[in-house]
């Protein structure tokens, strides 16, 4: 996936119908790859403070094999796919993911689809839904180390997940105890 410049990102997020303002504090942008490689981390996250780009890293905005192929074990309607090209103001607040990992936990409703066709692609299909469904921002490991995880597996069934553990903790440490964190999810353009 292409790495985007600060200006490219800002121009794109400001063009969305859901745009209200650029947050004055830290916020995140996720960019969903056109490739959507099955069970692979092929997306990017960008941390910004107001209009300043702080850092970027790799991850996924899509579910892995567990979510796409075994969704019936936790939700018979399908795997959650967060709606892209949307702003989610104050989406997250610092907390713990599953009580085990420092993370950003869902704080406000998110728009999403339920993908249940088992075709190994995370797709925005069916009706748009909205709700509190536990869409967190977290790492792909409970271990704090410098690994880069290759396969998504069960680490995402809708969550936004970083696979570079060291860079993930840079994001979490930088955000610190900020009250809430906004998110803008984009499709690669």
Q: What are the functions of these language-model segments?
A:
Residues 1-153, 167, 172, 188:
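Cell wall/extracellular polymer interaction/catalysis modules
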């Amino acid at each position: 996936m292409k790495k985007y410049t600060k200006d490219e990102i800002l121009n794109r997020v400001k063009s969305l119908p859901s745009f209200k303002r650029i947050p004055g504090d830290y916020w995140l942008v996720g960019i969903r790859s056109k490739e959507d490689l099955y069970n692979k981390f092929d997306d990017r996250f960008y941390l910004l403070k107001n209009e300043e780009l702080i850092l970027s890293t790799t991850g996924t905005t899509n579910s892995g094999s567990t979510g796409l192929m075994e969704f019936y074990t936790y939700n018979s309607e399908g795997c959650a796919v967060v709606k892209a090209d949307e702003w989610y103001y104050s989406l997250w607040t610092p907390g713990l993911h599953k009580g085990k990992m420092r993370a950003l936990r869902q704080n406000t409703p998110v728009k999403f689809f339920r993908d249940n066709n088992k075709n190994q692609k995370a797709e925005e299909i069916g009706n748009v839904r909205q709700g509190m469904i536990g869409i967190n921002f977290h790492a792909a490991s409970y271990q704090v180390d410098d690994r880069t995880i290759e396969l998504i597996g069960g680490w995402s069934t809708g969550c936004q997940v970083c696979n570079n553990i060291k860079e993930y903790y840079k994001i979490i440490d930088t955000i610190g105890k900020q009250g809430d964190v906004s998110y803008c999810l984009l499709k690669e353009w």
